[in-house]
């Protein structure tokens, strides 16, 4: 059921985000404790603000309330927000847009006994990711294919 809700909400919210030139990053429908949460993550170049999140929330809420039959029969909380500083990089377009940024990647299989890397994304071409990372005090370059990456997100360098 969760996937059906996500598909339907994505279908309903995409025209709203398109109209405002926002990017629809992700839609989640999850149960936490006793409650269900419908989370819509949006962004734009330069970052999204709280007023823009509220505007999308109001528009989506109105559209969801008008649906018959109701795509979400149980009670839920609607949250519209930014994906945050450590935004997930879910698509090839996300990676291309993040060239030069500090990122975190987790691989499906270890390379030299290591699965997790953080560094600067130097390039992403022909499905090859090139990451400049520190190994103790030395800069190293990691080259992996897009298919080797289990998860990627922006990271905050400490």
From Swiss-Prot:
HAMAP family for this protein: RimP
Organism from which the protein derives: Pediococcus pentosaceus (strain ATCC 25745 / CCUG 21536 / LMG 10740 / 183-1w)
Stored Pfam families: DUF150_C, RimP_N
Role, per record: Required for maturation of 30S ribosomal subunits.
Keywords: Cytoplasm, Ribosome biogenesis
Protein localization: Cytoplasm
Major localization class: cytoplasm
CDD domains documented for this protein: YlxS_C
A GO cellular component annotation in the UniProt record: cytosol
InterPro entries: Ribosome_maturation_RimP, RimP_C, RimP_C_sf, RimP_N, RimP_N_sf
Protein name according to UniProt: Ribosome maturation factor RimP
GO biological process, one term: ribosomal small subunit assembly
Family: Belongs to the RimP family.
